[in-house]
Amino acid sequence: MTAAAGDEPGPDVVLRALADPNRRQILRLVRGTELPAGQIAAHFANVTQQGISQHLRVLERAGLLSERRAGTRRLYTLRPEPLDQVRAVLAEFWPAALTQLKAAVERDNPPSGGTS
Amino acid sequence: MTSPDPLIATIRIAAPPTAVFPYLIEAPLLARWIGDATGSTPEPGGAFALAIGDSTSVRGQFLTVDPPKRVVFTWGVPGRDVLPAGSTTVEIVLTPDGPDTIVELTHHGLPRSEVASHQAGWTGLLDVLARVAAR
């Protein structure tokens, strides 16, 4: 376990890191296992080793990857804690939707108000 | 494996439950608050499909339709390894309060970080969230 909870990057950083399909693919690869950069790169025909290194850095900065040295190699694995922040984003989706529900229902069902 | 603590959202609407309930099940009315519905069969086992934003489609199936009180449906994103169809459920309960309705929405079964390492089915959620956040 690394980084205290208070040091987590904000959800924007996490979401930006996740916005790239190659980076999401990297996270899928290292979920539940540790891989060196070379083996990660081997899964991508169209991305250079340099490109992969850059993606790894972005993911690490977002707190989504943890790195461990094993001899001369660096092994990467998923660090899922920031996903809680992302879950918090979904927690904003439903209240926003309910606000739209309220607006729609109340527009369609105006209070009978005065007479008639 | 599912989340022990669901997401809960509530709101008060100035209309009786009978006026609110159709918005929870009928395609043209769902479109007014969640997303464009391409179909909805509001009965247990009946399916619906919604488009949220440009490219996120949600598929679900009604489990309970109890007008004008309660509706339960599954909520999933097909073709993604997160939120596979049927993996999470949304429950909406309508409670009359004078002339108003209290709406309580509970989303059960969302993946959490503690289980993400072991559980397939979370990265598609991230795709959805990225779009929600981008709005």
Annotate each language-model stretch with its function.
Chain A
Residues R16, R28, E60, S66, ...:
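A cross-family signal for key residues in well-ordered alpha-helices
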Residues M1-G10, R28-G32, L83-S116:
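Amphipathic alpha-helical dimerization/coiled-coil segments
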Residues L65-E67, P82-Q85:
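Alpha-helical interaction segments
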Residues T2, D12-T48, R74-D84:
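N-terminal helix-turn-helix DNA-binding core of bacterial DNA-binding proteins
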Residues E60-G71, T77:
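Beta-hairpin "wing" of winged helix-turn-helix
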Residues L56-R57:
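Short, hydrophobic-biased segments on the C-terminal half of alpha helices
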Residues D7-P9, A41, S66:
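Short hydrophobic/aromatic segments of transmembrane alpha-helices and their interfaces
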